[in-house]
């Protein structure tokens, strides 16, 4: 009886943690079937691989972050929305690059990659500048979306990483071979649109409950659990690519994902609800985000190969960052 009474307070936390994991599974599954359905639709209508790469694939891989951020903002949890984006950008560099290079090294000397990293770095600086205004409002959201439009326009003019474009062509070709019927395509699209919001609601609601129960801020939940969970699709994809010895494409995907997170996800979310910026973000987390962006930019400019030793350092850096967040929040 005594043991049962001791375990009772933790049961709610275990249930919430389980619901968060279920939510992540729904987000990952929903994003995957949404991309598959959209690719199949594009293949049937012979849509340009370039257009598919810039829209369908980019939106699909960032769908978990987008839906979680929108739902967080609507429900009054702006810290989770912004923490999700900032934390995902940090995890993308330290974790999503750090893990696969333990399996196979990643080359940074790729056509057009230096220009993409420059855009990511400039976008990061501009994004942090907007955060220091204290609130991301509709006006700032429009500015971010205008930046996204410029980025996509530049990509449409041919400033697209060639290896990434070839990967999209391969995906389109693979889907086209199956000659899927319209009803199956619509089933995939509909399933993705249903699973994503359900998964997002589980993650946001249960994550908020955990923050209250553990006595830590919603910002920390957004930066850690939520950001890590929404980055799982990118991590799984890069690890799979590493086993195929094709990790070079993953680097361009990480850079593109970080740009998309700041411009599209925050931009769209700000159109729906104003995002108040927690002071904790400005004192520590945005500087970590800028530091890892600068590291990646420098690595690409030097044309160095990111190998196992550097991967270990990246993972240690991510571990220290998470440790600092959790211990700082609990103290």
Segments and roles (model prediction):
Residues 1-331:
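Hydrophobic alpha-helical segments, chiefly the membrane-spanning helices
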């Amino acid at each position: 009886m005594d043991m049962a009474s001791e375990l009772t307070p933790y049961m709610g936390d275990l249930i919430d943690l389980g619901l968060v994991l279920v939510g992540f599974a729904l987000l990952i599954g929903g994003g995957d079937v949404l991309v598959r359905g959209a690719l199949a639709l594009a293949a049937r209508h012979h849509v340009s691989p370039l257009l598919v790469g810039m829209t369908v694939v980019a939106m699909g891989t960032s769908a978990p972050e987008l839906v979680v951020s929108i739902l967080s903002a609507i429900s009054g949890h702006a810290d989770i929305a912004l923490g999700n984006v900032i934390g995902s950008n940090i995890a993308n560099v330290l974790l999503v690059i750090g893990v696969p290079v333990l399996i196979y090294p990643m080359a940074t000397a790729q056509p057009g990659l230096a220009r993409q990293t420059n855009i990511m770095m400039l976008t990061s600086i501009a994004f942090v500048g907007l955060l220091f205004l204290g609130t991301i409002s509709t006006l700032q959201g429009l500015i971010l979306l205008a930046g996204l439009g410029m980025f996509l326009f530049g990509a449409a003019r041919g400033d697209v990483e060639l290896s990434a474009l070839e990967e999209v062509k391969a995906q389109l070709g693979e889907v086209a071979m199956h000659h899927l019927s319209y009803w199956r395509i619509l089933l995939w699209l509909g399933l993705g649109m249903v699973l994503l919001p359900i998964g997002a609601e589980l993650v946001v609601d249960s994550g908020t409950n955990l923050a209250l129960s553990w006595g830590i801020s919603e910002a920390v939940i957004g930066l850690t659990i939520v950001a890590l969970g929404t980055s799982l699709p990118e991590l799984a994809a890069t690890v799979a690519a590493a086993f195929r010895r094709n990790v070079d494409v993953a680097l361009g995907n990480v850079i593109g994902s970080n740009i998309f997170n700041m411009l599209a996800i925050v931009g769209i979310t700000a159109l729906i609800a104003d995002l108040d910026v927690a002071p904790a973000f400005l004192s520590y987390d945005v500087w970590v985000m800028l530091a890892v962006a600068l590291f990646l930019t420098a690595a690409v400019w030097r044309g160095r190969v990111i190998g196992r030793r550097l991967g270990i350092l990246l993972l240690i850096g991510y571990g220290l960052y998470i440790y600092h967040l959790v211990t700082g929040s609990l103290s």
